[in-house]
Structure formats: C-alpha cells, structure tokens
C-alpha cells in the first residue's frame, strides 16, 4: 500500500442493527492493527414507499403501504498498513450487509 492511499468502505443494509454491528467490527479491526479511522459517517437513509391495493377489484380506498429503508455508512481508513488490509480481508461480516471498498489517493 502506498503511504498516502486511503481505503473507503461503504456499507449498505436494510437492517440498522446489522450495519452498526458490521461497522463496529471493521472499526475495531482497523484500530487493532494500528490504522487511523475516519467515521463511521452515517449517510442519508433512502426510503422507498410502495402502495398496494388490497382489493383485487373494487374498494380503491383499501390500500396497504410499505416502506423499504436502506441504511448507509462510510468508513475511511487513513494510511492503512499491510496488516490492516490482511485483517480486513479475513473479516467475516453479516450476510445482510453490502460492502463496497474503494481506494482513494
């Protein structure tokens, strides 16, 4: 790793408990290996709302509404070491969390 590179880890999940747990694991692992951390930064929650008619034919007033919330977090690891990268690769996160990793100069 170059000394001036940063690792940006972006997490997405529908369950806020899972994303908080995964974020805590990433932060603890990075701190344990001696890297500096920026975050976790909570990003805006994306809310999708769906309205479905409950009746197949009549009663337009009878509807159900559903909401799907996507929680997002950003963790930036400043000046990571080889030890940090190895520890993050071995980390086993929850199945309901989408992880995107990018390198930033």
From Swiss-Prot:
Keywords: Ribonucleoprotein, Ribosomal protein. GO terms for cellular component: ribonucleoprotein complex; ribosome. GO terms for molecular function: structural constituent of ribosome; tRNA binding. One of its GO terms (biological process) is translation. SMART domains: Ribosomal_S10 (SM01403). It comes from the Bacteria. Involved in the binding of tRNA to the ribosomes. PANTHER family: 30S RIBOSOMAL PROTEIN S10 FAMILY MEMBER. Belongs to the universal ribosomal protein uS10 family. Part of the 30S ribosomal subunit. This is Small ribosomal subunit protein uS10. The gene is rpsJ.
């Amino acid at each position: 790793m170059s000394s001036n590179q940063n690792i940006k880890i972006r997490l997405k999940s529908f369950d806020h408990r899972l994303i908080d747990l995964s974020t805590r694991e990433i932060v603890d692992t990075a701190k344990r290996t001696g890297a500096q951390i920026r975050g976790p930064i909570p990003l805006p929650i994306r809310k999708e709302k769906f309205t479905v008619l409950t009746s197949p034919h009549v009663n337009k007033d009878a509807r159900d509404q559903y909401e799907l919330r996507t929680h997002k977090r950003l963790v930036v690891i400043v000046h990571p070491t080889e030890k940090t990268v190895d520890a993050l690769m071995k980390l086993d996160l929850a199945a309901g969390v989408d992880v995107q990793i990018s390198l930033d100069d």
